[in-house]
Amino acid sequence: MDVPQNKQIIELSWQNMRPELFIGDSGVTLKTGESIDIVLSEHRYCVGYVRFKARERTPCQDKATIPSGKEGQCNFCKQQDASFTAKTGYGLSRQAGDLLSADHAVYLAYFADDVIKVGVALWERREVRVLEQGAIACLFIGRGNGTMARNLERKIHTQVGLTEWVRLETKLKNLQKLPTQIHIQLALEGIFDRIRSITPSQIMFDTPDFHYLLPSYSLGPEVAESDILLVQSVPESTRISGTIVGVMGSTLLITAADAHVYAVGGRYLSGFHCVDLSSTFKHQLAGLELKKIPANRQRSLFDI
């Protein structure tokens, strides 16, 4: 994988249904089986922000430094960004108004361990949004403006009891013991029927739209066979080197020289520059703060 040198890492994102590490002004496609070798800079700077319907990113006016382990934006730029308004409903009044009047999808997303969450996304970003979250599958259940979609999401959360947030550890847990696609689809459709009976809405579809997303992540066999070491923070001057074995949502999965599978959140890379590989580095993946997500090697009903 060819990585531009002396360019800032902006984000790990999904473009045309494929994961890319956006560096400088171009995207580098992350392909399973390819090697990755980057050295992060000694300093980390805010990546700026993108407003709703804007085509270009606005640089941070303060060129603010960002500590490792945090999001790649300073507080000012974070609150200017369309994603902040989309998540919270707050922010610039005009941007909030534009977002709330735009079409949104209401969806159910399925994760490992039969965890199902409810969420909303801009209609034109609906498939990208569930890929960013690392959902195994999703069911689009309704369409309406931002206000109507959020109201339905809130009712489903409070009246049906679905979560609106899933921990990364849960998303990476038991990936080798997932049930069949049919089982997942039936589980989502069962929740959809329950929602219609408890809290019907005029923006809900008569027939929901199911998408099976697992193949998009191109998970290598190592992910199913090994414990996953979740990187808790990426400090300055870290060398990230290994073979890509998948991208789960916004998390890069790598096998390093020690044969372990490491999960590196894209948000920890955002803001660093990729410096020359000959540069001195202080840290490697094996020396970072890690949390083990054990592989479930027990047989399940679906193995019989």
Question: What does each model-found stretch correspond to?
Answer:
Residues 1-304:
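Non-catalytic accessory segments flanking enzymatic or RNA/DNA-binding domains
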